[in-house]
Amino acid sequence: VQRHIANEALQAIDERVSPLVFAGPVGTGKSCLAMLVARLFPRAITWSTPGVLGAICRARTSDSGQVEIPGPDGSSWWSESQFYARFESAPLAVLDDLGTRDLTEAQSDVLLELLNRRHGRGLIVTTNHNRNSLAESVGERIASRLLAGRQWWFDGADLRTRKAVR
């Protein structure tokens, strides 16, 4: 099943469908598949959504204006404009674990900006929310943008705990 989803996702990226949303319960392989797809793209970027949103919000209120995010070049301090330049230029971006925490208004603004900056470019977003709970978690405007692309629902038992029981 995941190979089929990966192939469909690659085709959607090739057709410039964006964003691609992998949704489903905890442990069903969404993040794993997103990372595997990202490995097929040199210079793809993958970040935790809560981490990125928090870092950018902190940068906007810090004296230095720097964002502390591990960068692919080994640097961990980027200005907000450097982060956005890298985010926009990547062939594929993955935002993992959207909606694991409630968003502040500032984080919602940053998320909206991230989605707008990747419009028409490869973007995979993973979330535990379904279509209905997504809008409750991130708001109607952001949910509308997320659902404008393509979605896949991952179903089944938590693969991590199932492996641990064996």
Model-identified regions with their sequence ranges:
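Walker A/P-loop nucleotide-binding motif
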Residues: 17-34
